[in-house]
Amino acid sequence: MYEDILLTPLDSSRKEEINSPQDLFISFLNKLEGWKTKCKNLHWAAPKKNIHVYLDEFLDILGDYQDGLAEGYMGILGKMQPNVIKGTPSDTLNAMDFIEEVRSDTLLFYNKIPQETIYKGITSECETFIQNINKYKYLFGLCDIRPY
């Protein structure tokens, strides 16, 4: 009797289905929000000052990129609802795994950005973000990084 009204909890690890440009951008903005939290956590848990400083710098880059992407999205597709950004958690435990996750997911996002001319600014900003990711991958590799 009650089985018919009970809901199955959502699995937070399930893959989101991307059906529209709105879904694509909101999904990636949620990843960026989650990465900001993960970057802060890794920054606070950093074993050495060098990686602590680089994670702090990369956090600023993440935030600036997320803000520009969100504003560009809204300039094209209209305002988003105030409760739509919820942050997708990251389970990485060190800076190198973290930057690799950011890199691979950003490249997937980049390849899905619509090709219409109106999206070229977003594409260009994403290319700059990819360049920053590559830079910080190199810098993180110079640091003493051990699993936490």
Where in the sequence are the language-model features?
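Charge-dense, intrinsically disordered terminal/linker segments
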Residues: 1-24, 121-124, 147-148
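Disorder-to-helix initiation segments
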Residues: 17-29, 35, 92-95
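Hydrophobic packing residues in well-ordered alpha-helices of helical domains and bundles
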Residues: 25, 32, 55, 99, ...
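Long, well-ordered alpha-helical segments
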Residues: 28-44, 69-72, 105-110, 133-143
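Helix-loop segments that flank and shape redox-cofactor active sites
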Residues: 34-57, 79, 112-120
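Conserved alpha-helical segments that form or flank metal/cofactor-binding pockets of metalloenzymes
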Residues: 50-81
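Long amphipathic alpha-helical segments
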Residues: 75-79, 139-148
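Acidic/histidine-rich alpha-helical segments that form the ligand environment
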Residues: 85-140
